[in-house]
Amino acid sequence: MATEVHNLQELRRSASLATKVFIQRDYSDGTICQFQTKFPPELDSRIERQLFEETVKTLNGFYAEAEKIGGSSYLEGCLACATAYFIFLCMETHYEKVLKKISRYIQEQNEKVFAPRGLLLTDPVERGMRVIEISIYEDRCSSGSSSSGSSSGSGSSSAGGGGAGAR
């Protein structure tokens, strides 16, 4: 695990950030937390469409699990009322447990899938659950030859995507 974390830190240090892509929330089924599975064209040469969609669908599944109301959620609510919410000083809620599972999954995906392709997935919790942010990195040694071709295309996409993520 230490070498995998080292690789993510190495990616941030040795590569320059080219652009960011934002995957927006999908409100087609109401306000439940889910993200669009539409493949962004900026990632076309970086990651296979199937891997991207599988990752987003897995995240959507985790968020559905977190928001699912079951017996344990009902019991948590009853205990919270009975203890004036002091119970949450001693235990994690079901939602918090699933959010930790999501963070571990994102870390694992970054190490195994995204970082080797020069990409970095940001936990949606860090962006207020509004977007999934994917940072696209370029090698500093190869950025001189490819920066002129990618700067015109990525400049317009990062300007549009940056506005959506900054709101």
Swiss-Prot record:
Record keywords: Cell membrane, Golgi apparatus, Lipoprotein, Membrane, Palmitate
Bilayer topology: Lipid-anchor
Compositional bias annotation for Gly residues: 158-167
Recorded superkingdom: Eukaryota
Pfam families assigned: Erf4
GO cellular component: Golgi membrane; plasma membrane
Extent of Low complexity compositional bias: 142-157
Predominant location category: membrane
UniProt similarity note: Belongs to the ERF4 family.
Summary of the function given for this chain in its UniProt record: Play a role in cell adhesion by regulating the plasma membrane localization of the palmitoyltransferase ZDHHC5. May be involved in protein transport from Golgi to cell surface.
Protein name: Golgin subfamily A member 7B
Organism: Mus musculus (Mouse)
